[in-house]
């Protein structure tokens, strides 16, 4: 008797505003209206988010952890505790390229790592979307519901979403990713790049992964405007220097929805 295939994951197309205003009571999957190659997982709780994505986070970008193999349950629990975190606090939002997710699941299979049901559900979603094929340019991001934790206020949720969407654009738009890389090399000084690395290392990112550094640079310096998460002094930078970098970034940025976001910030600043 043939085995029945898993039911298709339902995905709704939504704008940034619609996603931000959504109040999930269970996991909801959105396709971002301005860039359909970005999928958004909207979780009702940080626990639910962590169970699905913390092992991927450890594999892709967390400092002090291996990026060439997948952690077992025991190793992941120990790594989370060693950093003084819990399943809920390990990450507030997640972002991954299709290629990184494909590599994670391929290694988990080759190493015979027992994955949680939530991780298996994620695998099914990615298979449904065709993300395990070679050369797919796409990005998966996540965020938790407002009120799911005292830190996740309405404004914090909006900031997390904007930050993670910029990562989604980086992963799904090779032209934008190349622009960010060139900007990192040519517009920031060596000292500024070092200061950004130091800031990101303090946040738990693996500063040895260069692409991670310039991807986070664009997300924090250009699109994270909530002082709860980033202020220029965190990267040893003045407000004036950051404003100069933001203006230069906008000037050469590829056309599209994310450029419009940065332009709106600049217009609002000029109007004040």
Which residues make up each language-model segment?
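Active-site recognition of the HExxH zinc-binding catalytic motif
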Residues: 159-172
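Short acidic alpha-helical/loop segments enriched in Asp/Glu that coordinate divalent cations
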Residues: 174-187
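Short, flexible loop/turn elements at secondary-structure junctions
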Residues: 45, 144-147, 166, 174, ...
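Short catalytic/ligand-binding loop motif for oxyanion handling, primarily in non-cytosolic enzymes
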Residues: 23, 39, 49, 169, ...
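Metalloprotease/metallohydrolase-associated module, dominated by Zn2+-dependent proteases
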Residues: 24, 28, 33-36, 41, ...
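Active-site scaffold of zinc-dependent metalloenzymes
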Residues: 80-162
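N-terminal low-structure segments adjacent to metalloprotease catalytic domains
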Residues: 1-102, 255-272
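Short, solvent-exposed segments of well-ordered alpha helices
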Residues: 9-12, 17, 21, 152, ...
């Amino acid at each position: 008797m043939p085995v029945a295939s898993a039911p298709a994951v339902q995905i709704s197309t939504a704008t940034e505003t619609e996603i931000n205003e959504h109040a999930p009571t269970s996991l909801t999957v959105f396709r971002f209206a301005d860039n359909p190659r970005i999928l958004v997982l909207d979780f009702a709780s940080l626990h639910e988010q962590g169970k699905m994505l913390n092992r991927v986070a450890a594999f892709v970008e967390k400092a002090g952890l291996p990026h060439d193999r997948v952690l077992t349950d025991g190793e992941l629990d120990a790594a989370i505790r060693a950093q003084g975190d819990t399943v809920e606090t390990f990450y507030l939002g997640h972002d991954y390229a299709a290629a990184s997710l494909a590599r994670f699941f391929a290694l988990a299979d080759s190493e015979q790592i027992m994955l949680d049901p939530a991780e298996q559900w994620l695998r099914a979603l990615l298979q449904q979307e065709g993300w395990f094929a070679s050369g797919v340019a796409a990005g998966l991001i996540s965020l938790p519901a407002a009120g799911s934790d005292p830190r996740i206020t309405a404004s914090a949720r909006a900031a997390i979403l904007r930050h993670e969407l910029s990562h989604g654009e980086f992963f799904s738009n090779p032209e934008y990713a190349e622009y960010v890389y060139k900007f990192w090399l040519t517009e920031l000084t060596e000292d500024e790049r070092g200061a950004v690395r130091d800031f990101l290392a303090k946040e738990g990112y693996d500063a040895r992964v260069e692409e991670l550094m310039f991807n986070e640079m664009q997300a924090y310096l250009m699109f994270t405007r909530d002082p709860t998460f980033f202020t220029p002094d965190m990267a040893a930078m003045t407000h004036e220097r950051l404003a100069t970098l933001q203006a230069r970034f906008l000037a050469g940025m590829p056309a599209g929805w994310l450029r419009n976001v940065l332009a709106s910030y600049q217009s609002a600043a000029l109007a004040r």
